[in-house]
Amino acid sequence: MKSNLAVFFITCFFCCVFVTSDSVYTLPFPFPRDQVEILLELKNEFPSFNCDLTWKLDYFGRMDTRANISSWTKDSDSFSGVSFDSETGVVKELSLGRQCLTSLKANSSLFRFQHLRYLDLSENHFDSSPIPSGFGRLTYLESLDLSKNGFIGEVPSSISNLSRLTNLDLSYNKLTGGIPNLHSLTLLENIDLSYNKFSGAIPSYLFTMPFLVSLNLRQNHLSDPLENINYSATSKLLILDMAYNLMSHRILEPISKLANLIQIDLSFQKTPYTFNFDFLLFKSLVRLDLSGNSVSVVGTGSENLTHLDLSSCNITEFPMFIKDLQRLWWLDISNNRIKGKVPELLWTLPSMLHVNLSRNSFDSLEGTPKIILNSSISELDLSSNAFKGSFPIIPPYVNIMAASNNYFTGGIPLIFCKRYRLSLLDLSNNNFSGTIPRCLTNVSLGLEALKLSNNSLTGRLPDIEDRLVLLDVGHNQISGKLPRSLVNCTTLKFLNVEGNHINDTFPFWLKALTRLEIIVLRSNRFHGPISSPEVSLSFTALRIIDISRNSFNGSLPQNYFANWSAPLVNTPQGYRWPEYTGDEHSKYETPLWSYPSIHLRIKGRSIELGKIPDTYTSIDFSGNSFEGQIPESIGDLKSLIVLDLSNNSFTGRIPSSLAKLKQLESLDLSQNRISGNIPQELRELTFLGYVNMSHNRLTGQIPQSTQVGGQPKSSFEGNINLCGLPLQESCLRGNGVPSTPHTQEQELPKQEHALNWKAAAIGYGPGVLFGLAIGQAFARYKPVLFYKLFRL
């Protein structure tokens, strides 16, 4: 019994010791305590992890859950993004991409992980700061990814200490100076320095590093190597991307000796010289991009070539040498000066899938129906050429068909209804007439994007089946109502029916489409109210709505915008780098329907947006008959960039909540019946570049700021009694309007002068009375004390 009690007390003693000791962590594995402490110190270096959740979305819109540094605690299970060595327990890998980390310190705890082998800090917010030299202390590193961070300055020389490095990615930053010294990093297999501001000559050793497989120097300010290249027969370089630099035609001679190259991109070099490309010197090539240069091609091409881009090369003849390229499946000769017929040989290439012939002067397709119908082509772009007449026969397996900006006539051919799968059909900007074939919208066809704008199509819109992502039938002569079957298109993102004769009420039922981002109903015959007590209008994904130039009427409840979509309501957070989307001629595959083209009224002008940025937001209710007050809830739309409520009958005052729209760039309230003062808080809208409040009933002083007061006089003309810049009317007293600050400053001395006299009167009055009384007393009684003091 005594022994049991002894064991019990001893156990309790040790339990108390270990429980009360705050230096001991409960870990399921024997990780060194110092590693856990360093991890927690690293976490505390980044106090805020609040950022726009869209920053964590991958290319496909899925949430990136690889790591979450904000969840790190003493519990080792919480260290997502961290890998420990199974034998020693030290941290060997950190994957902290897309964590909204900021301000990487020069003495960061990060540089204490001496055994770290893999480090990913990509897509964070280290903007406008240099790369710390401390990275050079991580001598065990094998892979370092610092891409998409906004680092500036030169790469520290300490990077040359990383002798075990096999992968180095510094792309999409703002790094300057020459290419860093990587000569001693002989184990490198992949180097990506693209999308920076590196300048000077390319070091010749880069082409002959013993294990280097891929070298990406795209979009810098680099020029030809100055030194001769000492070629190695064992060079393993396979992929070379030097697009968007300052290379001359002379670069072809040295790189032609790299016998194993399979992919070369020399597109868009800023040189006046012609690239004389000899295929005989590049027998292993699989992919070649010479776009954006003046090119002369010699030889028949590599038998392994699968990808050829000669777009924007100023060529005048079809490249007939492709007839021998039996493995070629991707051809782009767009934006050249080629005329006449598309040769028959194009349809006979057995592997051909993608063909872009746009922006030339082709006028017809050569080849018999039998030959064309045997072609394997699945993506065909004939847009912006000189085709005319009826639409030609096309290969049977085409699933992406673009033929916009031509002169095609007649009805839309029914051959499209016989395609096995047609994802995209773009026949916009032609002279097609008649009705839209019902079969085009059958679910069995699988159409995802239908672009028929700027034709002469008539009749009603057919019922639309599911799967459609983009529908653009703007600027035709379509009548009737919007088909209610659109509510079944759960994938619809873009709807444009502008410039037709559609006669319908507001489509409240569209709010059921949870992915709908853009609605354009402009210039039709829509009518009636756009609010209803029975239906609360809430679009979950809407960011652009244009219902201008219709006959909508009624008033908008004060809470009208209270339940609108997250893209309009949420304030953008964090940083976005426009250059991350690639250059204008990026070759990354992107769905064609990602770039709908619409006309929007921005800053008083109609502007065509060919590629609408994902963060662009706009509301245009202009040219209707809305009345009543502008809802105060408009201030809830904190991400709004363009607001146009002009040419209506709105009354009441301008809501002060407009000052909450910190992203607003364009505001048009002209041609209404709005009264009262312009809210002075609008001075705080620092992005506001266009303001129009003309032809209302506004009074008082125009807010004096660059954004508002700096507008042209026409932006405020036609009001009752506005004053202040940019108008000539000054805000003097007596005009029934408040004083301007300048006038107030002039009047201030007068007011102070009057106040000073009043104060003097108040002070002098009692003093004078008191003096008279004392004087009388002196005169009558002559007190002895006063005589003694003043010797009177």
Swiss-Prot record:
Family matches, as PROSITE patterns: LRR (PS51450)
Residue positions the entry lists as glycosylated: 68, 107, 161, 230, 304, 314, 356, 374, 431, 442, 454, 488, 503, 553, 563, 647, 692
Positions of transmembrane segments: 759-779
Coiled coil feature spans: none
Record SMART domains: LRR_SD22, LRR_TYP
A Pfam cross-reference name: LRR_1
Cytoplasmic topological intervals: 780-792
Gene3D superfamilies, per database record: Ribonuclease Inhibitor
UniProt subcellular location: Cell membrane
Keywords carried by this UniProt record: Cell membrane, Glycoprotein, Leucine-rich repeat, Membrane, Receptor, Repeat, Signal, Transmembrane, Transmembrane helix
Signal sequence region: 1-21
Location, primary (coarse class): membrane
SUPFAM superfamilies for this protein: L domain-like (SSF52058)
LRR repeat windows: 114-137, 139-162, 163-187, 189-209, 211-233, 235-258, 259-282, 283-302, 303-324, 325-349, 351-374, 375-399, 400-418, 419-443, 444-470, 472-489, 490-515, 516-536, 539-563, 614-637, 638-661, 662-685, 687-709
Tagged with keyword Membrane: yes
GO cellular component terms, semicolon-separated: plasma membrane; plastid
Family: Belongs to the RLP family.
Protein name (record): Receptor-like protein 54
Species this protein is from: Arabidopsis thaliana
Lineage start: Eukaryota, Viridiplantae, Streptophyta, Embryophyta, Tracheophyta
